[in-house]
Design a protein with these regions (language model features):
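Extended, charged helical/alpha-beta scaffold domains that provide interaction surfaces
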Residues: 183, 187-190, 198-203, 405-406, ...
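Conserved P-loop NTPase motor core
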Residues: 2-442, 491-492, 509
Length: 636
C-alpha cells in the first residue's frame, strides 16, 4: 500500500543515496493530490522507485493514452521486486486495472431482472456448479423467463440484452456473498478482497455486474462505463524481464509461481528458532457448537491475561464474535472492512496483556504485533482461527502473526462442517456425513469430531479450494492472452505514431480506400441517403448535396467522390492551421484518437463477449477457443 511504499523509501533512501543511487516515490504523499506528469517524469528517472502495484498499473495505462512525447514518463521495464509477492501475483492476479471512459446507455432492466431472479428456485429454475462459481438457467427457468418477460424465445438475438441482464442478476444474487465478496457502506456497494477482508476502494466489477449487485441491494444504480484501457496484474508484471519478490507463504504455491511466471521459490531459514505451537484443529458438526467451543477456549486464554487475536473469514462472523464477547463482558477491538482506518492503532495494541482483537483475515499480512513486557511469559500471542480459510496461504499468514522473531505464541483453528469451505469445496462423503448426523435427534448427534477421516476431508476441502483458485487464475490468463497480444500491438503502433508522425494526404486516402472496402462488404450503399450518412459519420459534418448522377452502387465512383471530398477537407484544415508544426500535431492527434476509439470499442466488446462466451461451455463448445476466435475476427 501507499503508506508502506513511502515509509520504506524514506527508511532505505539514505542508504541508496550513500551508494550513489537516486530514489523516487511513485505514489502521492498527499492522497488528495494526484501526481502530475512532470513529477512522474522526475520520479521514474530515479534508479530505484518505490510504488504500489495499482499505482504502477494505472501509470502504465495512462501513459499509453498519451498523445505526445511530453506526456510520457515510464522508462523501459527491467527489474521489479514485489513485497508480499503471492498477494500481488496470485491473489490479485485476476483483478483487472481499468481506466473507465464515457458511460454506455444505461439499461432499465437491472431491477426488473433482479426481481425476476429472486422468484427462481435453485435446482428447479437454475443450477450452480459444485464450486459455486458458475450459475445458469435450466429449461424450466428459461420457460419462466419467457412467461415473465412475455417473449417467445429468450435466446433470440433480438433479446440479447434481456438474457445478458438475467445472467448478470443470477450471478449477482448467487455467486456474490455479502460481507465476504462485497459490503454496503453509505448506500454504495464496495468490493472486498476475499483473502484479506480489506475494502477495494475505487474498484468496480465490469460488464454490468456491479450494477446488478446494486440492484440486488436496492441502492442507487451507478452508471455502467466503458473500458478505455485495462490490464491484469498478471500481464503487468510479466512485462518485466527480471521479476522477484518475497513472502512468508511462497512455498505452498511454488508450482504455480513456476508455471505462470517461471519463478523458482527459495526458502530462507528463520533468524531465530520458531517457538510458536500450532495445535491441531478442533472440528465440530455445526457452527453454533463451534462458536461455543471457541468462545470457551478464548475465555480460558483471556482469564490468564494472554493476548488473543480471533481471525474470522467474513465481516459478518467478526460481528457475531464481537456480540458474544460483549455478552461475556470481555473488552475487545474489532478490525474489519468497516473500520480499516484504525488498523495500525488496533494492531499496535493487540500484543498487550488481556487484549482481545477480533479481525477478518486482513490482520494476517504486513502487520507486526509487538508483545508487551511480561506477555511472553504468559505464552505470547494466541491466534484463534474461527474457520479454515479458502487458501492454506491465508491460514499460514494468520498463524504467522504469533511467534514473530523467536517469540513464544500459539495458534489453533476451530472448524465446523457448516463452514463455507466444507459446503463449497468439501467432498460428497463429508457432506453426506453431515446430512446423516444432522438428521439425528440433537442428543444423539456427535459434537466434536475427532476421526482421522474427518480431519483428512477438511484438509482435502482446502486443497480443492486452492486448486479451484489456481484453475480460475489460469483461466483468466488464457482469456487475457488475446487482449495482451492486441494491447501490445496497439500500444506499439501508438508509440510509433507519437515518435515518428509521417502523415501525408496519400496516407489518409489509402485509409479511406481500405475503410470503404471493409464498410461496403457489410453495408453496401443502396441509395444516396446511405452514402450521405457515411459522410456525416466519418468525413465531415459539412457536406454539400451528393451529385444526382452518382451511382452509389458503383464502388469506384463512390471512392472517387469521397477522395475529392477528403482532399477538399484536408486542404481547408491545412489553410486554417497554417503552421506546419501545428498541422503535424493536429494530424497525429486525429490518428491517435481514431486508434484509441477503435481500441476502446474492442476492449469493451471483448469484456462483454468474455462474460457471454463462458456460458457456451455448457453448449459443448470450448469457451476459450470461441473467445480467441472471436477476438481475432473482431480485431481484424
Amino acid at each position: 500500500n501507499e503508506y508502506l511504499a513511502i515509509r520504506d523509501a524514506k527508511q532505505m533512501g539514505p542508504v541508496f543515496h550513500y551508494l550513489g543511487m537516486t530514489v523516487g516515490i511513485g505514489v502521492s504523499e498527499n492522497p488528495a493530490k494526484k501526481l502530475k506528469v512532470a513529477q512522474k517524469q522526475r520520479i521514474y528517472q530515479s534508479d530505484i522507485v518505490y510504488t504500489t502495484h495499482s499505482a504502477l498499473g494505472f501509470d502504465y495505462l495512462e501513459e499509453n493514452l498519451a498523445t505526445s512525447k511530453s506526456k510520457k514518463f515510464l522508462p523501459k521495464f527491467y527489474f521489479c521486486l514485489v513485497d508480499e509477492v503471492d498477494a500481488a501475483l496470485l491473489d490479485s492476479a485476476q483483478m483487472p486495472l481499468i481506466i473507465s471512459g464515457s458511460p454506455r446507455v444505461q439499461s432499465n432492466l437491472f431491477v426488473t431482472c433482479d426481481e425476476f431472479v429472486k422468484t427462481l428456485k435453485e435446482g428447479e429454475d437454475f443450477n450452480l456448479d459444485s464450486t459455486r462459481t458458475s450459475v445458469w438457467l435450466t429449461r424450466k427457468g428459461v420457460k419462466e423467463a419467457e412467461i415473465y418477460f412475455r417473449v417467445q424465445n429468450v435466446y433470440d438475438p433480438n433479446n440479447h440484452q434481456l438474457i445478458r441482464q438475467i445472467n448478470l442478476a443470477l450471478r449477482a444474487n448467487h455467486l456474490f456473498e455479502k460481507d465476504r465478496k462485497y459490503t454496503v457502506e453509505n448506500g454504495e456497494v464496495k468490493l472486498m478482497d476475499e483473502a484479506t477482508g480489506r475494502l477495494l476502494e475505487g474498484n468496480k466489477l465490469q460488464s454490468g455486474l456491479h450494477q446488478a449487485l446494486e440492484a440486488r441491494e436496492r441502492v442507487k444504480i451507478s452508471l455502467e462505463t466503458r473500458s478505455m484501457a485495462s490490464i491484469t496484474y498478471q500481464n503487468l508484471f510479466k512485462m518485466f524481464p527480471k521479476l522477484a519478490g518475497m513472502t512468508g507463504t511462497g512455498r505452498v504455491c511454488k508450482d504455480e509461481f513456476r508455471e505462470v511466471y517461471g519463478l523458482g521459490v527459495v526458502v530462507v531459514p528463520t533468524r531465530k528458532p520458531n517457538q510458536r505451537i500450532d495445535y491441531p484443529d478442533e472440528i465440530y458438526l455445526t457452527i453454533p457448537q463451534k462458536l461455543y467451543a471457541s468462545l470457551e477456549y478464548i475465555k480460558a486464554l483471556h482469564s490468564k491475561g494472554q493476548p488473543v487475536l480471533i481471525a474470522t473469514g467474513s465481516v459478518g462472523m467478526s460481528e457475531i464474535y464481537s456480540m458474544l464477547l460483549l455478552r461475556e463482558g470481555i473488552a475487545h477491538n474489532v478490525l474489519n472492512a468497516h473500520n480499516a482506518a484504525k488498523e495500525a492503532e488496533m494492531i499496535a495494541q493487540a500484543g498487550r496483556r488481556c487484549a482481545v482483537t477480533v479481525a477478518t483475515s486482513m490482520a494476517g499480512r504486513g502487520t507486526d504485533i509487538i508483545l508487551e513486557k511480561g506477555v511472553a511469559e504468559l505464552g505470547g500471542l494466541a491466534v484463534v482461527g474461527t474457520e479454515r480459510m479458502a487458501s492454506e496461504r491465508v491460514d499460514l499468514q494468520l498463524r504467522g502473526r504469533a511467534g514473530r522473531q523467536g517469540a513464544p505464541g500459539l495458534s489453533k483453528f476451530f472448524v465446523s462442517l457448516e463452514d463455507d469451505l466444507i459446503t463449497k469445496s468439501g467432498s460428497k462423503w463429508i457432506n453426506d456425513y453431515y446430512q446423516r448426523e444432522i438428521a439425528k435427534p440433537e442428543e444423539k448427534q456427535k459434537t466434536r469430531l475427532t476421526s482421522f477421516r474427518i480431519k483428512y476431508e477438511v484438509e482435502e476441502a482446502q486443497k480443492n479450494s486452492d486448486n479451484s483458485g489456481a484453475a480460475s487464475r489460469r483461466s483468466t490468463e488464457q482469456y487475457d492472452e488475446s487482449i495482451r497480444i492486441q494491447r501490445q500491438i496497439i500500444y506499439s503502433k501508438r508509440n510509433k505514431i507519437i515518435a515518428h508522425p509521417d502523415f501525408t494526404l496519400d496516407y489518409f486516402l489509402s485509409v479511406l480506400s481500405d475503410a470503404m472496402d471493409d464498410y461496403t462488404k457489410k453495408n453496401p450503399f443502396k441509395e444516396q441517403a446511405d452514402l450521405y450518412r457515411f459522410v456525416l459519420d466519418n468525413i465531415s459534418y459539412y457536406c454539400e448535396d451528393i451529385p444526382a448522377s452518382l451511382d452509389v452502387t458503383d464502388l469506384q465512383q463512390v471512392k472517387k467522390f469521397l477522395s475529392s471530398l477528403i482532399i477538399t477537407e484536408y486542404q481547408k484544415k491545412k489553410d486554417r492551421i497554417q503552421d506546419p508544426e501545428m498541422f503535424d500535431q493536429f494530424q497525429r492527434i486525429v490518428v491517435l484518437r481514431a486508434v484509441d476509439d477503435c481500441w476502446v470499442e474492442q476492449v469493451d466488446y471483448l469484456q462483454q463477449f468474455q462474460s457471454l462466451v463462458i456460458s457456451q461451455g455448457y453448449a459443448q463448445k470450448n469457451p476459450v477457443f470461441e473467445f480467441h476466435k472471436e477476438a481475432f475476427e473482431s480485431y481484424k
